[in-house]
A protein has these predicted regions:
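Alpha-helical structural context
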Residues: 155-156, 200, 264, 307
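Soluble non-cytosolic domains of exported or imported proteins
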Residues: 66-70, 85, 139, 143-144, ...
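Short, glycine-/small- and polar/acidic-enriched structural segments
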Residues: 29-161, 165-169, 178, 185-191, ...
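Pocket-lining segment of extracytoplasmic ligand-binding domains
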Residues: 90, 171-265
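Short, low-complexity disordered leader/linker segments with a strong preference
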Residues: 1-30, 328-331
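Residues within well-ordered alpha helices
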Residues: 47, 53, 152, 196, ...
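Conserved C-terminal helix/tail region of periplasmic/extracytoplasmic solute-binding proteins
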Residues: 300-331
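Secondary-structure end/capping motifs
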Residues: 229-311
Length: 331
C-alpha cells in the first residue's frame, strides 16, 4: 500500500513538473520588431537582446530590418511587424492621413539627433557661419535628420534655403559614397560612418547635431492602438526589457556596451563600436528611461513645423502612451 502511495505521489509530482514546464513554454510570446535601420545608435535595444532582458520577460524577438520610415510604417500598418522602431514624426504623418487605428508611441529609445556635421577639409575654430556659401549634402526631405539639420542651421543664423547649396535628393544609403566621391563641402552623417571617414582622412567631424537640437523623440518604439489593447501585457513586458537595458547602458562603460552589442555588428571593429557608443553616451543620445514626455513631443513638432513638414498639430496624449512606461519605472 505504501509503495502504491509513493508511486502515486511520484506520478503526481511528475505531472505537475511537466505541466509547469509546458505552461512556461507556452508563455513565450514572439514579437516581430521592425527597425528603420541597423545602427549602434540603437545600442540599448541590442543590449536588451544580448543580455537576455527580453528572454527574462518571456519574449522572443524577431528583429527585422525595414529600412526607411515609409517602409517601416507600411510594414506596421499591414501587420508585417508588431512593433516599429522609427522616428516619432512617422506617427504624426500616419495620423494626419486619417488613420482609424493610429500608431501609438509607447517607449522612447533615443532622445537626440544621431548625426554629425562632417567637413571635407580640416577646420580650425569651426563656426556655423562657415557653412554660408558652401555645398551641404543633407538627408532625405521630411525625415528627422534633415529636419533637425535645418532647425540647427536656422538656430545659428544659417538659412538652409538661401545661404548655402542644399543637396537632399540622394538616397540615404548613397549619401556617404556621394561625399567620398567629391560631392559637397559638408555632409550630415550617422555613426560609425562619420568616425570611419575621420579615420580614413575623408572628412572631419566638426559639430554634433544631437548636442544642438535638444531632446526630441528621435527614435521610438511604437505600435498600433489596437495591438496595445489586445496585447497590453506583451507591450508592458517589452517596455520593461527596454528599461532594464537603458539602465544597464547608463551604468556600464562604453567598452562594456560595445562588447555586449558586438555580435550584432560583426563587420565593425570593437574599438570603433566603443568610440561610437562613447560619443553617443557623452552627448546623452540614449534615453535613460522609456517615457516620451510632453516637452520632447512639442520640441519635435516645433522642428517639423520650422521645416514645413508638420501636417497638423497633435496633442501629446493622442499619439503617446506614457502609462505603460510610467508603470514599469515605478515597479
Amino acid at each position: 500500500m505504501r509503495l502504491i502511495k509513493s508511486s502515486i505521489v511520484l506520478f503526481a509530482t511528475f505531472i505537475l513538473i511537466f505541466s509547469l514546464a509546458a505552461c512556461g513554454k507556452s508563455e513565450v510570446q514572439k514579437v516581430r520588431v521592425g527597425e528603420v535601420t541597423h545602427s549602434i545608435f540603437y545600442a540599448p535595444q541590442y543590449v536588451a537582446l544580448s543580455e537576455g532582458f527580453f528572454e527574462e520577460e518571456g519574449l522572443e524577438i524577431d528583429l527585422q530590418g525595414t529600412f526607411g520610415g515609409d517602409k517601416t510604417m507600411t510594414a506596421l500598418l499591414s501587420d508585417g511587424i508588431d512593433i516599429a522602431l522609427v522616428g516619432s514624426e512617422t506617427s504624426i504623418y500616419v495620423y494626419a492621413q486619417g488613420a482609424t487605428d493610429p500608431v501609438i508611441n509607447f517607449a522612447q529609445l533615443t532622445q537626440t539627433d544621431g548625426t554629425f556635421l562632417v567637413s571635407r577639409e580640416k577646420v580650425e575654430n569651426f563656426s556655423w557661419d562657415q557653412l554660408k556659401g558652401s555645398t551641404f549634402l543633407g538627408q532625405r526631405k521630411g525625415g528627422m535628420p534633415q529636419m533637425v539639420g535645418e532647425f540647427v542651421l536656422n538656430k545659428h543664423g544659417v538659412d538652409p534655403q538661401t545661404d548655402l547649396e542644399l543637396i537632399q535628393n540622394i538616397e540615404f544609403a548613397n549619401i556617404a559614397n556621394a561625399f567620398a566621391s567629391g560631392t559637397g563641402d559638408y555632409v550630415q552623417l550617422f555613426e560609425p560612418t562619420a568616425s570611419i571617414f575621420e579615420q580614413e582622412g575623408k572628412g572631419h567631424i566638426v559639430a554634433s547635431f544631437g548636442k544642438e537640437s535638444g531632446h526630441v523623440p528621435y527614435t521610438t518604439f511604437m505600435t498600433k492602438e489596437s495591438y496595445i489593447k489586445e496585447n497590453k501585457e506583451v507591450v508592458e513586458k517589452f517596455t520593461r526589457a527596454i528599461y532594464k537595458a537603458q539602465k544597464w547602458v547608463e551604468t556600464h562603460s562604453a567598452k562594456e556596451v560595445a562588447e555586449s552589442i558586438a555580435p550584432y555588428f560583426e563587420d565593425t571593429p570593437i574599438d570603433l563600436i566603443e568610440t561610437v557608443v562613447e560619443r553617443y553616451k557623452e552627448q546623452g543620445s540614449f534615453a535613460t528611461d522609456p517615457i516620451l514626455d510632453e516637452e520632447e513631443w512639442n520640441n519635435l513638432q516645433t522642428i517639423m513645423d520650422d521645416a514645413g513638414e508638420l501636417p497638423t498639430d497633435v496633442e501629446h496624449g493622442i499619439l503617446v502612451n506614457t502609462d505603460i512606461a510610467e508603470s514599469v519605472i515605478s515597479e
